[in-house]
Structure formats: C-alpha cells, structure tokens
C-alpha cells in the first residue's frame, strides 16, 4: 500500500519513518531542498512532555492585554485583517477556562509522554545521535506569584504520573550550577527530571536517512498545489502540474495545512504562531546551562547542545510574516545576559524565526478525516519536536488499523465538530508556495 506524505519537517519525516516500519511504501514531498528546513530548523530544542501546556489558559486574556504594553512581552498580536486570525483568537479565548485547560493539557501530556517513550526506544534501537541530553528541564519562577500559579500544572502532572521536583534557590544552583551567581533574582523552580534536549534539525536529517534505508523516497523542491477529490476519497495530489496518486495521504504541512484543506470543506483551526531563536556558541561550558531552562516570565527556553546554546520562544500572532524583528533579538539577548552572562558569545549568534502551527486548544490534530484515505498530522504548535515520534507512530498505527499504544481520544479533527462542509470537486488551493 502506497502512502504519500506531504511535508518533510520533523512531523512528516517521523510519520514516514514509522509508516515504513509497518511495511508501507512511502513517498515524502516537500517544497524545500532538504528535510527540516522550516519550523523544525532551529527550534528551542527541548523535549518536555511535562511542560506540554496550551497557551489558552485561565488569566491569559488579561495577561495578553498587559503584554501588549511591554517591550519584552512573550506574546504579541499584529492584526492582519485576516478573518481566520480573528476566528482562531476567538476559539482560543473560549479555551481559556480552568475546565478546558485541564482537558487540553491532559491530551497534550498524554501524547508527549508517549512520544518521549517512542524516542527513547528509537534511540536505544538505532543509536541515532542528535546532540541529545537527558538531564531534565527546570522552569524558573522570578516571582512568588508565578510559583504559586504552578499548582494547577502540578495537579495535572500528579494525575498523569509525571515525576517532578520543586526547587528553592539552592536547589536551582544544585541542578544548574551556572545559575548560582544569579539565584537571588529567582523565587523558585519546578524541575521535571525526565525531560530531554536535542537538535531537532539534526535528528530529522538522521531519521530521514534511516527512513531512506527502509525504502522511503524523499522528493524535494516540489510545488504541492492542491488535493484532488471526489465524494469521500482523495484521488491524488497535484504536484508541479502532475497528479500524483497513492492509497493513503498524510498532510503534515504545519501552518499551511488549513489552506490546503479548505477547498475540501475541512476547517482545520491551525494558525501560525511566529517564534524566534538565537543559537549562541559556548565560550565557557561551566557558565552555560547543563540542560534546558524555561524562563516563565518571558516564556523562553534556553537549551544546551554540545557546543551551542539555543535560546528560543515568544509568540507573535502575525500571519505568515517571516521577517526578523530586531526587538525580539534584543529580548533573547537580554535573557541570556540576565541568566548566563559568561556562557556564550552573543556577537557570533545566529538569529532565526519560524511559524509554529498552533491550534486554539493547544492539542495537535492527529488522525483520520471525513475523507476515507486522508489523514492529518499537524497543529503541534511549540511542541512539534516533543510530540514528533509519538505522533508519527500513532498515525502509522491508525493508518495500519492497529490498536495504538495510547488512547487517541480527543486528538483528531472531529473534536471541533465541523470536520467537513460540502465542497466542490476540483477547487484549487495554490497555497504551499513561496
């Protein structure tokens, strides 16, 4: 059985790998010249199942108003006049309740924990190397109010059986010695010892090589134009003016997925959250982080690779704009100087931006659609790296009609209740272009 995977980021590549392991004949198509060239290229590098949390949370609407007035705010909104942007923000606001937050976080943690287990198994079986570390994640709280507010997250961690540790200032210095000199500005921390780090782009490149050895074909520089359909089946995909056919189709196009689905009558509430990162060469390993640090105030992660620090985070709701905002670089540099002033050479840092495909409830869309042979693996937001292996393996099981190792409840598009409207056959969607 032939499967055509659209998109070669970490999600599409993981999907292809796990499908090939199940014996499918897999072809991956992407517009870029190699895998992981867009959102997967320079993300923060953290694999943090326990910190899998939706942006839509109680109190966020009021915080967002305050953030609009701050220079180093973690969230910025640039209104584009796009109706989809307004609808997405309205849906997000509806998820900012305690009850919805608990449901959404449970779904995210469920998939993230499974994904980490799949990654551990993959690493043990294959020895795949991607500058990984398994030294946990430490979330820093600069105020007592932030520390107190972590109680709701801890409740979900306990419910999900995720190990955690609350740290005072001395405890922070114990797990992250380079923070000893600045611990006075911190109120405490929450540490998840089972979290990991790694270079997502390097991992995806290595995984693609392994997939090729299993028979997967990668085709790069291809213009994915539209899906061709009739009734409840996909007939093929128009690629560079030619109709490509398969038995099953997987859409893993990140933020560009909804525009490809709209002509089919499928409303996928995925919208780009623009994020930024700095990659900083380490000058003094003893003064750099040992693993991943999350700065709760600025919603930024600082991650240690072998000889580099990756600083990433923030979110701009600004459509598909990929311009580099110098103010965001200023914020990232400020945070590095604040916490690790002697760890790296900021003058040699590389600045990057990418579009994370976010759903209004934070949970990705993984699973079947109203079309019998079309499957989605998209909407992972800031957690594509964390959820990649689990999402790929879960989707492969669903396509193979095998019982998944975790519950898939609440993960597919049917949770939005509008999985398909009547669509006209042959309507074009020339969206996956630059």
From Swiss-Prot:
Positions bound to FAD: 3-17
Essential cofactor(s): FAD
UniProt GO BP: D-alanine catabolic process
Catalytic activity: a D-alpha-amino acid + A + H2O = a 2-oxocarboxylate + AH2 + NH4(+)
Record keywords: FAD, Flavoprotein, Oxidoreductase
NCBIfam families: PRK00711.1 (NF001933)
UniProt protein name: D-amino acid dehydrogenase
Native species: Pseudomonas entomophila (strain L48)
Gene giving rise to this polypeptide: dadA
